[in-house]
Amino acid sequence: CPFGPEGFSDWGTGFEQVEIGMLGVHWAPELVEELNRLSARPGVHFVWLTSWEDMAPKYLCHAIGLEGRHWPVLRYSEQKGTREWWKLEAIQRDISRHRPGRAVWIDDQLGFEESALAWMAFLGRGILGISPDPRRGIARADILRVEAFLDG
């Protein structure tokens, strides 16, 4: 939860907290377990697309037990600035490069980025976008949607 938790997680426990540098990070351990399980699925390729950039695999993974130290990092500095939102350009370039049959994009800002929503609508069934509430984080229902999408 990037802005601190609000209430309880829907994962069956309260949020855990750890300080990483100057940032307090809140997370649900069950969510981390599910992300680790999903990332180990054959054919599934996770990438980091976060303003944390290299700090995510370097510090966040160790702090919360996420097995994402070796996931590729899409960086702001590698974008050409052709889009209003650098993350949209980054994911477009990554998808063009790797050509996955399906893609899932989870970002708490996603629901507020009209150009990203329009691009995903254009792609249609090939992409699933999830924009979790930043005060609740990724919910159990979000993970179920991801699994159904990947299995579909």
Feature roles, as predicted:
Residues 1-84:
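Alpha-helical substrate-recognition element adjacent to the catalytic core
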Residues 55-152:
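C-terminal cap/substrate-recognition subdomain and adjoining C-terminal extension
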